[in-house]
Amino acid sequence: MRGTGYILHAYLLDKNFNIIYCHYNIGKFPWGAILNGNYYYINDINEIVKVNLTTFESKSIASNGKAFMADNDENFIYYSNEFSELYKLSPDDESSIKIADNALFFSVQNKYIYASGGDNGNKIIYDKNGKIIADYSACVNMGADSAFQINDKIYTIFNGGVAYMDLDGKNYGEMMQ
């Protein structure tokens, strides 16, 4: 049977580019992380999937509504759901706790989470337990989902330049092309 669609594949590779794991059920925002010998990713039906890299057994783990986007640090997985709620998931016991609202798009950078979206569209900096550090909504071109940290600044590339600010949302600026 001929179809008009195509199937996307994601490959987990080792340092020598050998395929360790392959999956075809990729979510809208491709993300993957290896924590404690397990590979985690969001599948095409918005579930967080855990794959044991020794046995290659996989299972969906709790996601309190559909997982929309995810990021991680060295200890936890953070994910937002369709209701713009931000959760912190422990890979050890697979438990999740809600830490914030209005965080559809986000990025985990060092000790802070840079979030935006939700009903009010505000941009908020949270600590990793959900405490609000600052509102950076006035930083027009600072995107939460594409933020990256270099030394003591957060940067985002936008159409026309680079936006930057201090880790706490202060001293916002833009460099234009």
Please state what every model-predicted region is:
Residues 25, 63, 77, 108, ...:
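Peripheral, non-catalytic segments that deliver or gate enzyme domains
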Residues 10, 32-33, 70, 115, ...:
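Small side chains
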